[in-house]
């Protein structure tokens, strides 16, 4: 699983692909977005993963509360925001992802299924104070999956601990913005000039600590 392996090992597969396709390709744009994902995850998970072992804390719920915080900060209704619109599943996007994952034999069919599935479930679990919310929560509870699935649907009210966790995550988020910019420029040099990858890439999506 990618979350458990050093990110530089993945990038080693990608360097020759981008050199072939070019830095103006859609695949490169997708890959740079994935680098942003890597930076944000590795920074925030360093805090979230150990924090989620505390009583009453949940990994997905903490991330969801931070999503709520950011959406409200930008003036959006976090409960009903159509988050699935941020997951395109058009042919161009599917082809770009296919090029990035070509070394891993991931078919376009599987990519389309994954993206379409994400869009479907994000839309299904986005609901305000409605009968739909009541029914979904009831099904989660009677099937004993509530704890596992709770974080996939934003609660109507923020958790009591969210003010504290959001403040910490905001610091990690701000740090990630500058770090992502630095690492993107570094990766670009590794592709275009053959320079070695930044040592920060020798971490996982779970932590910002080097593996060795």
Regions found by a protein language model. Give the residues of each.
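N-terminal leader/auxiliary helical segments
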Residues: 1-31, 35, 39-212
């Amino acid at each position: 699983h990618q979350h458990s392996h050093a990110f530089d090992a993945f990038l080693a597969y990608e360097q020759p692909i981008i050199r072939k396709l070019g830095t103006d390709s859609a695949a490169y744009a997708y890959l740079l977005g994935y680098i942003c994902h890597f930076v944000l995850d590795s920074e925030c998970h360093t805090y979230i993963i150990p924090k989620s072992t505390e009583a009453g804390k949940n990994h997905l719920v903490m991330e969801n509360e931070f999503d709520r915080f950011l959406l409200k900060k930008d003036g959006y209704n976090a409960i009903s925001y159509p988050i699935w619109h941020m997951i395109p599943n058009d042919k161009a996007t599917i082809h770009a992802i296919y090029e990035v994952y070509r070394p891993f034999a991931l078919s376009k069919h599987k990519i389309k299924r994954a993206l379409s599935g994400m869009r479907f479930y994000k839309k299904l679990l986005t609901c305000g104070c409605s009968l739909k919310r009541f029914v979904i929560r009831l099904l989660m509870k009677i099937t004993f999956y509530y704890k596992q699935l709770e974080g996939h649907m934003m609660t109507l009210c923020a958790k009591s601990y969210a003010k504290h966790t959001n403040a910490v995550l905001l610091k990690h988020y701000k740090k990630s913005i500058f770090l992502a910019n630095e690492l993107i420029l570094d990766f670009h040099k590794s592709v275009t000039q053959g320079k070695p990858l930044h040592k920060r890439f020798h971490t996982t999506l779970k932590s910002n600590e080097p593996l060795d």
